[in-house]
Amino acid sequence: MTTVTLTSSDGVDITVDRDVAERSILIKNMLEDLGESDEAIPIPNVNEVVLKKVIEWCTHHKNDPPSTGDDDDSRRKTTDIDEWDQKFMQVDQEMLFEIILAANYLDIKALLDVGCKTVANMIKGKSPEEIRKTFNIQNDFTPEEEDQIRRENEWAEE
């Protein structure tokens, strides 16, 4: 099994199986560009803790078939998450958002989907006030602006 070394943004080298690292389209393309080089691949936007978490997910999913364009629509229409991924995503909000940012940067579409579905499930069925509380968001609307928005979006409440 061939391994590659990834260097996190905080300068930590992590050795990982090549097939695991190649779950990331970004890393796969970099490896193709580098050829047979043993050079470490810098991952400047992802720190060690988050990179290890992403590698854990990639290791679990290393044998998953690559996603095709065909399943994009059906995948997007559901917020169902398999049991292992649900447990994996049981992290604090900061880590959840860091995983989403890392998945986006590293171009790991399936992990990005799981992260976004996790956030969608956190929002589902909640009022704006509950969502603000969940994500610690300040309400910057005046009562008049809120009323106007409610009137403009009455159709969505039906």
UniProtKB/Swiss-Prot annotation:
UniProtKB keywords: Ubl conjugation pathway
Domain of life: Eukaryota
A Pfam short name: Skp1_POZ
MF terms (GO), sorted A to Z: cullin family protein binding; DNA replication origin binding; glutathione binding; ubiquitin protein ligase activity
GO biological process entries: exit from mitosis; G1/S transition of mitotic cell cycle; G2/M transition of mitotic cell cycle; kinetochore assembly; mitotic cell cycle; mitotic nuclear membrane biogenesis; negative regulation of cytoplasmic translation; negative regulation of mitotic metaphase/anaphase transition
Pathway where it operates: Protein modification; protein ubiquitination
Interaction with the F-box domain of F-box proteins, as annotated region: 100-158
GO cellular component: CBF3 complex; cytoplasm; kinetochore; nuclear SCF ubiquitin ligase complex; nucleus; RAVE complex; single-stranded DNA-dependent ATP-dependent DNA helicase complex
Keyword Chaperone applies: no
InterPro entries with a match to the protein in the record: SKP1 (IPR016897), SKP1-like (IPR001232), SKP1-like_dim_sf (IPR036296), SKP1/BTB/POZ_sf (IPR011333), Skp1_comp_dimer (IPR016072), Skp1_comp_POZ (IPR016073)
Gene3D superfamilies (alphabetical): Potassium Channel Kv1.1, Chain A
Subunit structure: Component of the SCF (SKP1-CUL1-F-box protein) E3 ubiquitin ligase complexes.
Family matches, as PANTHER family: SKP1
Its job: Essential component of the SCF (SKP1-CUL1-F-box protein) E3 ubiquitin ligase complexes, which mediate the ubiquitination and subsequent proteasomal degradation of target proteins. Controls sulfur metabolite repression, probably by mediating the inactivation or degradation of the metR transcription factor.
Family, similarity comment: Belongs to the SKP1 family.
Name of this protein: E3 ubiquitin ligase complex SCF subunit sconC
Species assigned in the record: Aspergillus fumigatus (strain ATCC MYA-4609 / CBS 101355 / FGSC A1100 / Af293) (Neosartorya fumigata)
